[in-house]
């Protein structure tokens, strides 16, 4: 793999290579319960990297499908009452069957319904919680200065609260920002890379949660799975940005880079 020195100092390239190769070999079936804004993008991201996404959201099917899935993402971005019921069923079954799952608490704290739903989902023991700094602060019980889905808090500032949240919930916590942090409360991995243009394409952050769910399907260590997924994202983001003239070309190049990411 080509040199990405800051990234490699934080997370060994060997682990990324092993996990990416295993994902491409096994193509984990990933149950995606995400928001309507990013569904198509998320599916394309997972297909590009080598996973098998399935967008099953119906209350009548959610529990049945999660039993055969290798990983589950629950993203509350455009949550409805019916979605909340289906998500609770899926998370309950995932907890009962030891299916690893990711909670993405989009804009938690900004509105009451999604906040209450997220609190209930936390009780069902997500394997990984992925969010921006404001969302992680809110979940840790801190009054963050959130403005919807964008973060006004630095990811480094949120790290102590991510560690606290991990300790409270038992989940690995992944904080997205200029530098990504992945922590299990005791060990923390820093992921460097990516590019600011990634914030100009809707769904990029949400699809990282889905990618983590896919990596959980092939890697039993949730800290390593989250770090490998974040690193793949960062590498693809950095390379795509160098080839892009703006958000439109970046979106296309990002999918291509995920698909073509070389193992050298």
Swiss-Prot record:
Keywords (A to Z) from UniProt: ATP-binding, Kinase, Magnesium, Metal-binding, Nucleotide-binding, Thiamine biosynthesis, Transferase
Pfam families to which the protein is assigned, alphabetical: HK (PF02110)
Cofactor(s) needed by this chain: Mg(2+)
EC number from the UniProt entry: 2.7.1.50
Family indicated by similarity: Belongs to the Thz kinase family.
GO function term, MF aspect, one: hydroxyethylthiazole kinase activity
Residue sites binding substrate per the record: 55, 203
The name this protein goes by in its record: Hydroxyethylthiazole kinase
Function noted in UniProt: Catalyzes the phosphorylation of the hydroxyl group of 4-methyl-5-beta-hydroxyethylthiazole (THZ).
GO BP: thiamine biosynthetic process; thiamine diphosphate biosynthetic process
UniProt-listed Gene3D superfamilies: 3.40.1190.20
Lineage per the UniProt record: Bacteria, Pseudomonadati, Spirochaetota, Spirochaetia, Leptospirales
Top EC category: transferase
Organism: Leptospira borgpetersenii serovar Hardjo-bovis (strain JB197)
InterPro entries reported for this sequence: Hyethyz_kinase, Ribokinase-like
Keyword Kinase: yes
Pathway this chain belongs to: Cofactor biosynthesis; thiamine diphosphate biosynthesis; 4-methyl-5-(2-phosphoethyl)-thiazole from 5-(2-hydroxyethyl)-4-methylthiazole: step 1/1
Protein residues bound to ATP: 130, 176
Catalytic activities: 5-(2-hydroxyethyl)-4-methylthiazole + ATP = 4-methyl-5-(2-phosphooxyethyl)-thiazole + ADP + H(+)
